[in-house]
Regions:
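Alpha/beta-hydrolase fold nucleophile elbow
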Residues: 89, 96-108
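Proline/glycine-enriched tight loop/beta-turn segments at coil->beta junctions
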Residues: 6-16, 28, 100, 241-246
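Mature extracellular/periplasmic domains of secretome proteins
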Residues: 35-39, 119-120, 237-239
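Cap/lid segment of the alpha/beta-hydrolase catalytic domain
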Residues: 10-12, 20-83, 91-95
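A short, hydrophobic beta-strand element of the alpha/beta-hydrolase
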Residues: 105, 132-134
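Substrate-access "cap/lid" subdomains that shape
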Residues: 91, 116-117, 125, 134-266
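Short beta-strand-to-loop junctions in surface cap/lid or active-site-entrance loops
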Residues: 1-12, 22, 232-242
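Glycine-rich nucleophile elbow surrounding the catalytic serine of serine-hydrolase chemistry
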Residues: 25-26, 107-117, 257
Protein backbone atom coordinates (compact mmCIF):
# COMPACT_ATOMS: atom_id res chain seq x y z
CA UNK A 1 0.00 0.00 0.00
CA UNK A 2 1.33 3.43 -1.00
CA UNK A 3 0.03 6.85 0.05
CA UNK A 4 0.73 9.78 -2.27
CA UNK A 5 -0.09 13.30 -1.07
CA UNK A 6 0.43 16.99 -1.84
CA UNK A 7 3.25 18.88 -0.16
CA UNK A 8 2.52 20.23 3.34
CA UNK A 9 -0.63 18.19 3.82
CA UNK A 10 -0.20 16.67 7.30
CA UNK A 11 -2.31 19.25 9.14
CA UNK A 12 -5.14 19.11 6.60
CA UNK A 13 -8.11 16.80 6.03
CA UNK A 14 -7.94 16.14 2.30
CA UNK A 15 -10.28 13.89 0.29
CA UNK A 16 -8.90 10.38 -0.17
CA UNK A 17 -8.98 8.46 -3.46
CA UNK A 18 -8.34 4.73 -3.17
CA UNK A 19 -7.14 3.20 -6.48
CA UNK A 20 -7.76 -0.44 -7.43
CA UNK A 21 -5.73 -1.41 -10.51
CA UNK A 22 -7.05 -3.46 -13.42
CA UNK A 23 -5.62 -6.45 -15.26
CA UNK A 24 -8.37 -9.07 -15.27
CA UNK A 25 -7.60 -9.80 -11.61
CA UNK A 26 -4.80 -11.97 -12.97
CA UNK A 27 -2.13 -9.31 -13.62
CA UNK A 28 -1.25 -5.69 -12.85
CA UNK A 29 0.47 -3.76 -10.08
CA UNK A 30 -0.09 -0.48 -8.24
CA UNK A 31 3.21 0.98 -9.51
CA UNK A 32 2.00 1.21 -13.13
CA UNK A 33 0.14 4.44 -12.40
CA UNK A 34 1.28 8.04 -11.85
CA UNK A 35 -1.26 10.15 -9.98
CA UNK A 36 1.00 13.16 -9.38
CA UNK A 37 -1.02 15.47 -11.66
CA UNK A 38 -4.33 14.40 -10.12
CA UNK A 39 -2.91 15.05 -6.65
CA UNK A 40 -1.44 18.44 -7.60
CA UNK A 41 -4.50 19.77 -9.40
CA UNK A 42 -7.19 18.56 -7.04
CA UNK A 43 -5.39 18.45 -3.68
CA UNK A 44 -6.31 14.88 -2.80
CA UNK A 45 -4.51 11.93 -1.24
CA UNK A 46 -4.24 8.87 -3.48
CA UNK A 47 -3.85 5.41 -1.98
CA UNK A 48 -2.69 2.62 -4.31
CA UNK A 49 -2.65 -1.05 -3.36
CA UNK A 50 -1.57 -4.46 -4.53
CA UNK A 51 -3.77 -7.49 -3.91
CA UNK A 52 -3.48 -11.20 -4.59
CA UNK A 53 -4.19 -12.17 -8.20
CA UNK A 54 -5.18 -15.21 -10.27
CA UNK A 55 -5.52 -18.55 -8.47
CA UNK A 56 -3.68 -17.10 -5.46
CA UNK A 57 -6.34 -14.40 -5.19
CA UNK A 58 -9.43 -16.46 -5.96
CA UNK A 59 -9.35 -20.23 -5.55
CA UNK A 60 -12.39 -22.35 -4.72
CA UNK A 61 -11.98 -25.87 -3.37
CA UNK A 62 -14.15 -27.77 -0.84
CA UNK A 63 -11.11 -29.20 0.93
CA UNK A 64 -10.11 -25.64 1.84
CA UNK A 65 -13.35 -23.73 2.29
CA UNK A 66 -15.38 -26.73 3.46
CA UNK A 67 -13.27 -27.21 6.60
CA UNK A 68 -13.22 -23.56 7.67
CA UNK A 69 -15.47 -21.14 9.52
CA UNK A 70 -16.28 -17.45 9.19
CA UNK A 71 -14.21 -15.47 6.70
CA UNK A 72 -12.00 -18.50 6.07
CA UNK A 73 -14.91 -20.08 4.19
CA UNK A 74 -14.65 -17.53 1.39
CA UNK A 75 -12.42 -18.14 -1.63
CA UNK A 76 -12.35 -14.46 -2.57
CA UNK A 77 -8.91 -13.80 -1.07
CA UNK A 78 -8.16 -10.86 -3.37
CA UNK A 79 -11.41 -9.21 -2.35
CA UNK A 80 -10.49 -9.65 1.32
CA UNK A 81 -7.10 -8.02 0.64
CA UNK A 82 -8.80 -4.92 -0.75
CA UNK A 83 -11.22 -4.78 2.18
CA UNK A 84 -8.37 -5.06 4.69
CA UNK A 85 -6.54 -2.22 2.94
CA UNK A 86 -9.70 -0.10 3.17
CA UNK A 87 -9.99 -0.86 6.88
CA UNK A 88 -6.39 0.26 7.39
CA UNK A 89 -6.97 3.47 5.43
CA UNK A 90 -10.17 4.25 7.33
CA UNK A 91 -8.31 3.86 10.63
CA UNK A 92 -4.99 5.53 9.79
CA UNK A 93 -5.34 7.98 6.91
CA UNK A 94 -5.89 10.96 9.24
CA UNK A 95 -2.24 10.59 10.26
CA UNK A 96 -1.27 11.40 6.66
CA UNK A 97 -3.56 14.41 6.24
CA UNK A 98 -6.50 12.50 4.79
CA UNK A 99 -10.17 12.62 5.73
CA UNK A 100 -11.38 9.18 6.93
CA UNK A 101 -14.95 10.32 6.26
CA UNK A 102 -14.32 11.20 2.61
CA UNK A 103 -12.90 8.12 0.88
CA UNK A 104 -13.62 7.44 -2.80
CA UNK A 105 -12.77 4.04 -4.26
CA UNK A 106 -12.02 4.01 -7.98
CA UNK A 107 -10.73 1.47 -10.46
CA UNK A 108 -10.58 0.56 -14.13
CA UNK A 109 -11.51 -2.69 -15.91
CA UNK A 110 -11.04 -5.43 -13.29
CA UNK A 111 -10.46 -2.59 -10.83
CA UNK A 112 -13.88 -1.21 -11.79
CA UNK A 113 -15.27 -4.70 -11.38
CA UNK A 114 -13.81 -4.82 -7.87
CA UNK A 115 -15.35 -1.43 -7.11
CA UNK A 116 -18.80 -2.80 -7.99
CA UNK A 117 -18.19 -5.95 -5.96
CA UNK A 118 -17.25 -3.83 -2.93
CA UNK A 119 -20.44 -1.81 -3.32
CA UNK A 120 -22.32 -5.10 -3.16
CA UNK A 121 -20.30 -6.70 -0.36
CA UNK A 122 -21.62 -6.59 3.22
CA UNK A 123 -18.01 -6.78 4.43
CA UNK A 124 -17.14 -3.41 2.87
CA UNK A 125 -20.10 -1.44 4.17
CA UNK A 126 -19.08 1.88 5.73
CA UNK A 127 -15.45 1.70 4.57
CA UNK A 128 -15.87 4.26 1.74
CA UNK A 129 -18.22 7.07 0.82
CA UNK A 130 -18.12 7.40 -2.99
CA UNK A 131 -17.24 5.09 -5.88
CA UNK A 132 -16.09 5.33 -9.51
CA UNK A 133 -16.18 2.24 -11.75
CA UNK A 134 -14.37 2.72 -15.09
CA UNK A 135 -15.23 -0.04 -17.58
CA UNK A 136 -16.34 -2.27 -14.72
CA UNK A 137 -18.50 -5.39 -15.03
CA UNK A 138 -20.50 -7.65 -12.74
CA UNK A 139 -19.34 -11.13 -13.79
CA UNK A 140 -19.16 -13.71 -11.01
CA UNK A 141 -19.19 -17.50 -10.67
CA UNK A 142 -21.10 -19.96 -8.55
CA UNK A 143 -19.07 -22.15 -6.21
CA UNK A 144 -19.83 -25.11 -8.49
CA UNK A 145 -18.55 -23.25 -11.56
CA UNK A 146 -15.38 -22.10 -9.83
CA UNK A 147 -14.60 -25.59 -8.53
CA UNK A 148 -15.90 -27.59 -11.52
CA UNK A 149 -17.95 -30.09 -9.56
CA UNK A 150 -19.90 -31.51 -12.49
CA UNK A 151 -19.12 -32.55 -16.05
CA UNK A 152 -21.09 -29.71 -17.63
CA UNK A 153 -19.03 -27.12 -15.77
CA UNK A 154 -15.74 -28.85 -16.62
CA UNK A 155 -16.59 -28.91 -20.32
CA UNK A 156 -17.61 -25.23 -20.18
CA UNK A 157 -14.58 -23.95 -18.29
CA UNK A 158 -11.18 -25.61 -18.39
CA UNK A 159 -9.90 -23.24 -15.71
CA UNK A 160 -12.18 -24.51 -12.93
CA UNK A 161 -9.88 -25.43 -10.02
CA UNK A 162 -10.63 -29.15 -9.88
CA UNK A 163 -10.24 -29.49 -13.63
CA UNK A 164 -6.83 -27.77 -13.59
CA UNK A 165 -5.53 -29.88 -10.71
CA UNK A 166 -6.93 -33.12 -12.15
CA UNK A 167 -5.74 -32.57 -15.71
CA UNK A 168 -2.19 -31.78 -14.65
CA UNK A 169 -2.19 -34.00 -11.56
CA UNK A 170 -0.10 -31.49 -9.63
CA UNK A 171 1.94 -33.30 -6.98
CA UNK A 172 -0.29 -36.37 -7.17
CA UNK A 173 -3.66 -34.63 -6.90
CA UNK A 174 -5.69 -37.58 -8.21
CA UNK A 175 -4.55 -39.94 -5.44
CA UNK A 176 -5.40 -37.69 -2.51
CA UNK A 177 -8.67 -36.69 -4.17
CA UNK A 178 -9.78 -40.33 -4.32
CA UNK A 179 -9.04 -40.78 -0.63
CA UNK A 180 -10.97 -37.62 0.22
CA UNK A 181 -14.00 -38.67 -1.79
CA UNK A 182 -14.01 -42.08 -0.11
CA UNK A 183 -14.03 -40.60 3.40
CA UNK A 184 -14.17 -36.79 3.62
CA UNK A 185 -14.13 -36.69 7.40
CA UNK A 186 -11.05 -38.89 7.70
CA UNK A 187 -9.00 -37.41 4.87
CA UNK A 188 -10.24 -33.79 4.91
CA UNK A 189 -7.26 -32.36 6.79
CA UNK A 190 -4.80 -34.42 4.72
CA UNK A 191 -6.40 -33.08 1.55
CA UNK A 192 -6.15 -29.52 2.84
CA UNK A 193 -2.47 -29.94 3.78
CA UNK A 194 -1.78 -31.34 0.33
CA UNK A 195 -3.39 -28.36 -1.40
CA UNK A 196 -1.46 -25.91 0.77
CA UNK A 197 1.78 -27.72 -0.08
CA UNK A 198 1.45 -27.15 -3.84
CA UNK A 199 4.19 -24.84 -5.06
CA UNK A 200 2.66 -21.46 -5.88
CA UNK A 201 4.87 -20.98 -8.93
CA UNK A 202 3.82 -24.36 -10.35
CA UNK A 203 0.16 -23.49 -9.84
CA UNK A 204 0.55 -20.15 -11.61
CA UNK A 205 2.48 -21.72 -14.50
CA UNK A 206 -0.21 -24.37 -14.93
CA UNK A 207 -2.97 -21.77 -15.19
CA UNK A 208 -0.83 -19.71 -17.53
CA UNK A 209 -0.28 -22.64 -19.91
CA UNK A 210 -3.97 -23.56 -20.02
CA UNK A 211 -4.95 -19.92 -20.59
CA UNK A 212 -2.92 -19.83 -23.81
CA UNK A 213 -5.14 -22.43 -25.46
CA UNK A 214 -8.58 -21.42 -24.27
CA UNK A 215 -10.92 -18.45 -24.17
CA UNK A 216 -12.21 -19.66 -20.82
CA UNK A 217 -11.88 -17.25 -17.92
CA UNK A 218 -10.27 -18.09 -14.63
CA UNK A 219 -13.15 -18.24 -12.12
CA UNK A 220 -12.46 -15.07 -10.18
CA UNK A 221 -15.24 -13.60 -8.06
CA UNK A 222 -17.18 -16.45 -6.46
CA UNK A 223 -20.73 -16.15 -5.12
CA UNK A 224 -20.11 -17.54 -1.66
CA UNK A 225 -22.59 -15.47 0.36
CA UNK A 226 -19.73 -14.12 2.50
CA UNK A 227 -17.55 -11.65 0.61
CA UNK A 228 -19.86 -11.72 -2.42
CA UNK A 229 -23.66 -11.89 -2.54
CA UNK A 230 -24.89 -15.45 -3.01
CA UNK A 231 -26.76 -14.43 -6.19
CA UNK A 232 -23.91 -12.39 -7.66
CA UNK A 233 -22.77 -8.77 -7.89
CA UNK A 234 -25.87 -7.42 -9.66
CA UNK A 235 -28.15 -8.92 -7.02
CA UNK A 236 -25.82 -7.64 -4.33
CA UNK A 237 -25.97 -4.12 -5.75
CA UNK A 238 -29.76 -4.22 -5.71
CA UNK A 239 -29.80 -5.55 -2.14
CA UNK A 240 -27.25 -3.00 -0.94
CA UNK A 241 -28.94 0.02 -2.53
CA UNK A 242 -30.85 0.98 0.62
CA UNK A 243 -27.95 0.27 2.99
CA UNK A 244 -25.07 1.67 0.97
CA UNK A 245 -26.73 4.61 -0.78
CA UNK A 246 -23.66 6.61 -1.86
CA UNK A 247 -22.69 8.62 -4.98
CA UNK A 248 -21.44 6.38 -7.81
CA UNK A 249 -20.02 7.12 -11.26
CA UNK A 250 -20.02 4.16 -13.67
CA UNK A 251 -19.02 4.24 -17.32
CA UNK A 252 -16.93 2.74 -20.11
CA UNK A 253 -13.54 4.03 -21.21
CA UNK A 254 -13.50 4.83 -24.93
CA UNK A 255 -10.18 3.11 -25.66
CA UNK A 256 -10.53 0.27 -23.17
CA UNK A 257 -9.56 -2.45 -25.67
CA UNK A 258 -7.10 -0.54 -27.87
CA UNK A 259 -4.12 -1.94 -25.98
CA UNK A 260 -5.03 -5.49 -26.99
CA UNK A 261 -5.63 -4.89 -30.70
CA UNK A 262 -1.92 -5.08 -31.50
CA UNK A 263 -1.67 -8.61 -30.12
CA UNK A 264 -4.90 -9.87 -31.72
CA UNK A 265 -3.91 -12.26 -34.52
CA UNK A 266 -7.23 -11.66 -36.31
Amino acid sequence: LDIKAPVNNLNRRLPVMFWIHGGGNTSGIKDYYDFSELIRRHQVLVVTINYRLGPLGWFTHPAIQGLQNGLDKTSNFGTLDIIEALKWVKKNIKNFGGDPDNITIFGESAGGHNVLSLLASPLAEGLFHKAISQSGYTTSFTVEEAYGSDQAVISNNKLASDNVLSTHDLSGYSSIKKLFLSNQQRYGEDYQRYLRSIDGKSLLETYKQISKDTYDRLPILTRDGIAVHIDGVSAGLAAAKKKNNIPVIAGSNKDELSLWLGSNRY
